[in-house]
Amino acid sequence: MPRFTIHDLAATIDARAASGGDASYTRKLLDKGSGHCAKKFGEEAVETVIAAIENDRHHLIAEGADLMFHFLVLLKARGVTFEDIEFALAQRTTMSGLEEKAARNRE
């Protein structure tokens, strides 16, 4: 199976978002607004947690994929790119987790 990365998924979401009248699921989510996208992300997060608690590997993988998709759609709805998230993660690697958390609390 060919490798499919989170960047590939983000590019697919970008293409479907730009597709105008296309009836894709992605386009329908975005057309309903960021609030709806956030609710869908929350639903998928709960389903992912349940799968993890139930120790169901197959279900966790499926729900994790759904969660990643809905996270990227939510980011798109709010004008945030995955590269923005990567930048924030990269900044955090320059300090320990405890230092990073303390810095956030000062802001």
Swiss-Prot record:
Give the enzyme's EC designation: 3.6.1.31
Principal EC category: hydrolase
Pathway assignment reads:
Amino-acid biosynthesis; L-histidine biosynthesis; L-histidine from 5-phospho-alpha-D-ribose 1-diphosphate: step 2/9
Key words of the record = Amino-acid biosynthesis, ATP-binding, Cytoplasm, Histidine biosynthesis, Hydrolase, Nucleotide-binding
Q: Name one Pfam family in it.
A: PRA-PH
- Name the reaction it catalyses: 1-(5-phospho-beta-D-ribosyl)-ATP + H2O = 1-(5-phospho-beta-D-ribosyl)-5'-AMP + diphosphate + H(+)
Q: Which InterPro entries match?
A: HisE, PRib-ATP_PPHydrolase-like
Q: Where in the cell is it found?
A: Cytoplasm
Q: Can you supply one Gene Ontology CC term for this chain's record? A: cytoplasm
* GO annotation, biological process: L-histidine biosynthetic process
Supply the Gene3D superfamilies for this chain.
MazG-like (1.10.287.1080)
State one molecular function term (GO).
ATP binding
Which family does the record claim for this protein? Answer: Belongs to the PRA-PH family.
Could you identify this protein by its name? Answer: Phosphoribosyl-ATP pyrophosphatase
The source organism is Nitrobacter hamburgensis (strain DSM 10229 / NCIMB 13809 / X14)
The gene behind this protein is hisE
